[in-house]
Amino acid sequence: MIPVVIEQTSRGERSYDIYSRLLKDRIIMLTGPVEDNMANSVIAQLLFLDAQDNTKDIYLYVNTPGGSVSAGLAIVDTMNFIKADVQTIVMGMAASMGTVIASSGTKGKRFMLPNAEYMIHQPMGGTGGGTQQTDMAIAAEHLLKTRHRLEKILAQNAGKTIKQIHKDAERDYWMSAEETLTYGFIDEIMENNELK
């Protein structure tokens, strides 16, 4: 159930679902697994807010275990495409594809709440349902290309080498807010709506 907010206006009461009300303040919630429907909703909101006023920041709150690489990269590409700065604020966790999205916020405007976590790892994949050796080889090659593309983005976002990201992402690599700040994925830790 989505909460409803009631506001008093000069014309009387007006009710909004909570997400529409947050959108009025240029806040987008990216929560739950990254998948096509969620990505399309986030992209539409980014495009709407950028068209409305591209001189004001957009606030993207992130709490996701990750998910679809293609859906996540569509969000990242849109964040880079629009003119408005996108502040990212990680609450809860940014894991897997979530780290790619959260770390792609505007440099200097990537934040994290003190008890949130970051996790990087190599992408997971399957054979796409095919069981023939050639299908498996094609899927493996695609997975390696995808891994390199994600490592390149993460390296750029953190100011690390691709080699370092490759090594750290070999297995699940969890980081606290302080560790994420030191690593370079965020710019500041936010506490009580103030920077730490």
Swiss-Prot record:
Give the principal location in a single coarse category: cytoplasm
Cytoplasm as UniProt keyword: yes
Report the family membership: Belongs to the peptidase S14 family.
Catalytic site positions: S96 (nucleophile), H121
Record field: catalytic activity: Hydrolysis of proteins to small peptides in the presence of ATP and magnesium. alpha-casein is the usual test substrate. In the absence of ATP, only oligopeptides shorter than five residues are hydrolyzed (such as succinyl-Leu-Tyr-|-NHMec, and Leu-Tyr-Leu-|-Tyr-Trp, in which cleavage of the -Tyr-|-Leu- and -Tyr-|-Trp bonds also occurs)
- Name the chain's protein: ATP-dependent Clp protease proteolytic subunit
- Record localization: Cytoplasm
Q: Which GO terms describe its cellular component?
A: cytoplasm; endopeptidase Clp complex
Which InterPro entries does the entry link to? Answer: ClpP (IPR001907), ClpP/crotonase-like_dom_sf (IPR029045), ClpP/TepA (IPR023562), ClpP_His_AS (IPR033135), ClpP_Ser_AS (IPR018215)
Q: One MF term in GO for this entry?
A: ATPase binding
**Which CDD domains does the UniProt entry name for this protein?**
S14_ClpP_2
Q: How does it assemble?
A: Fourteen ClpP subunits assemble into 2 heptameric rings which stack back to back to give a disk-like structure with a central cavity, resembling the structure of eukaryotic proteasomes.
Q: Which SUPFAM superfamilies match?
A: ClpP/crotonase
For the keyword Hydrolase, the answer is yes
**Enzyme class, broadest EC rank:** hydrolase
Give UniProt keywords alphabetically. Cytoplasm, Hydrolase, Protease, Serine protease
* EC assignment: 3.4.21.92
Give me the gene this protein comes from: clpP
